[in-house]
Amino acid sequence: MTLAARGVPFPVILSAPSGGGKTSIARRLVAERNDVGYSVSCTTRAPRPGEIDGRDYYFLTPEAFDEAAVRGAFAEWAIVHGNRYGTLKREVERVIAAGRHVLMDIDVQGARAFSVAFPDAVRIFILPPSGGVLLERLAMRASESAASFALRVRNARDEVAAAHEYEYVVVNNELERAVAQIASILDAEGARRDRLRALDSQIDSVIAELDAAVGGA
């Protein structure tokens, strides 16, 4: 079922410390649900092995990123781990125009800025099952130097501390379970009365029929 048949599209923010698994979860949700579209972010960092420009990120030079920021092309942007990351307004508009929820995997800074501009956004924090597991995931990244690893650990601590700012927290102990939990959150949020504007006329029609039945009794 497409979102157009259910209600009004809304932004969905997935945040997690580096190595928290938010990108894997986002890909699964987009692959399994036709009411979700992915907003590809921009970054100035170098691509990791296997990453593809336009699918994982739009990889920009610092100069190109700054030019886009000056033009007001970003809905939000932030500096994370020494690199710039940003969400393009046109990416958000593209997904909304297709009648789908806009799914974004962005950091805590970006989530704060985006939520100011889009207060209807649903924020979900992906929490690792333990600090030890997160450290193992970070250590497995071949692109991590010792200095970069230490920076990511410090930043991860600060990001986990911000989890209380989110409407939902999902522990990513097992990918299938985490994806299922977030899918349930999307279904529940989509069924909220204030998001079902498309059903207003149907609600009024049911009330009218019941009123007529009572009046005719």
Kindly give the residue locations of the regions a language model identified.
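Conserved lysine of the Walker
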Residues: 22
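Conserved phosphate-donor/acceptor-positioning beta-strand/loop module used by diverse small-molecule
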Residues: 102-107, 117-140, 171-172
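Post-Walker A alpha-helix
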Residues: 25-26
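NTP-dependent small-molecule kinase module
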Residues: 161-217
